[in-house]
Amino acid sequence: MGVTPVSNEPLVAQQPKGIIDPSTGKPIGSNDAFFGEINNELADKGFLVTSTDELINWARTGSLMWMTFGLACCAVEMMQLSMPRYDVERFGFAPRASPRQSDVMIVAGTLTNKMAPALRKVYDQMPEPRYVISMGSCANGGGYYHYSYSVVRGCDRVVPIDIYVPGCPPTAEALLYGVLLLQKKIRRTGTIER
């Protein structure tokens, strides 16, 4: 049981590329005895060396807590995302009821002028870094009710949006794809300073 080696040579970590010194053709600092000993010590023991920012971003993408701001029929599709067929929790995307414990807010449905201050208040209660997914045509730009006197024409007028999920209503697959895009965006950009 286990992996059988193809050859009898021991596994060795990749050599760091770093900044190459043109005169020697080796990375700068490669002849430093201190770092040479550390590299030799860690190379054969299976350690992975990375930056703290990359580690934090990796952990953040795998443990996003979301809260719903379900305002209309898109919320039904959002509920379907948590059911066994799609099971968004396998991607580390778990629901929370309190904005103080959540990282992501999903705005699903028609945002009215009377509801806009409540949306902003809930957004302000979320800890940094916080992300917002706008789900459906009504949340994205007013949708079917775009010309109504009481509808905000897109929740991006109230809170900054990170991911837009189009559709009326968007399917659970589309929302799941939006969640995966948000995780990719966090990995790529790190913490977003607002």
Swiss-Prot record:
Q: How does it sit in the membrane?
A: Peripheral membrane protein
Q: Name one GO cellular component term.
A: plasma membrane
SUPFAM superfamilies, per this entry?
Answer: HydA/Nqo6-like (SSF56770)
Is Repeat among this UniProt entry's keywords? no
GO MF: 4 iron, 4 sulfur cluster binding; iron ion binding; NADH dehydrogenase (ubiquinone) activity; NADH:ubiquinone reductase (non-electrogenic) activity; quinone binding
| Top enzyme category | translocase
The cofactor required is: [4Fe-4S] cluster
Q: Where in the cell is it found?
A: Cell inner membrane
Under Pfam families, the record lists: Oxidored_q6
Describe how the cofactor binds: Binds 1 [4Fe-4S] cluster.
> What processes does the entry annotate via GO biological process terms?
aerobic respiration; electron transport coupled proton transport
Chemical reaction(s) catalysed: a quinone + NADH + 5 H(+)(in) = a quinol + NAD(+) + 4 H(+)(out)
Q: Which positions are annotated as binding [4Fe-4S] cluster?
A: 73-74, 138, 168
Record EC number: 7.1.1.-
Per UniProt, the keywords (alphabetical) are: 4Fe-4S, Cell inner membrane, Cell membrane, Iron, Iron-sulfur, Membrane, Metal-binding, NAD, Quinone, Translocase, Transport, Ubiquinone
Q: Which family does it belong to?
A: Belongs to the complex I 20 kDa subunit family.
**Known partners and oligomeric status:** NDH-1 is composed of 14 different subunits. Subunits NuoB, C, D, E, F, and G constitute the peripheral sector of the complex.
Q: What does this protein do?
A: NDH-1 shuttles electrons from NADH, via FMN and iron-sulfur (Fe-S) centers, to quinones in the respiratory chain. The immediate electron acceptor for the enzyme in this species is believed to be ubiquinone. Couples the redox reaction to proton translocation (for every two electrons transferred, four hydrogen ions are translocated across the cytoplasmic membrane), and thus conserves the redox energy in a proton gradient.
Concerning HAMAP family, the annotation shows: NDH1_NuoB (MF_01356)
Q: What is this protein called?
A: NADH-quinone oxidoreductase subunit B 1
Q: Which organism is it from?
A: Rhizobium etli (strain CIAT 652)
> Gene encoding it?
nuoB1
